[in-house]
């Protein structure tokens, strides 16, 4: 997800997005542990999306 898409959302929507990304990350980690995950780059992408959302939440909290 692009940062420009995330910037248009408010804090509540970002919180929901963060929750869904954390659930997705957990599912991907479980798939990796059981060796069912073929595309391991998905983990990296989700982790970076989580960082983007958390950064924007921090920015919005400071304003």
Swiss-Prot record:
GO molecular function terms attached to this record: structural constituent of ribosome
InterPro entries associated with the record: Ribosomal_protein_uL29 (IPR050063), Ribosomal_uL29 (IPR001854), Ribosomal_uL29_CS (IPR018254), Ribosomal_uL29_sf (IPR036049)
Gene Ontology terms: cellular component: cytosolic large ribosomal subunit
Name the record gives this protein: Large ribosomal subunit protein uL29
CDD domains the UniProt entry points to: Ribosomal_L29_HIP
Keywords, comma-separated and alphabetical: Ribonucleoprotein, Ribosomal protein
Pfam family, one: Ribosomal_L29
Family statement: Belongs to the universal ribosomal protein uL29 family.
Source species: Bordetella petrii (strain ATCC BAA-461 / DSM 12804 / CCUG 43448)
Listed GO biological process terms: translation
Xref: PROSITE patterns: RIBOSOMAL_L29
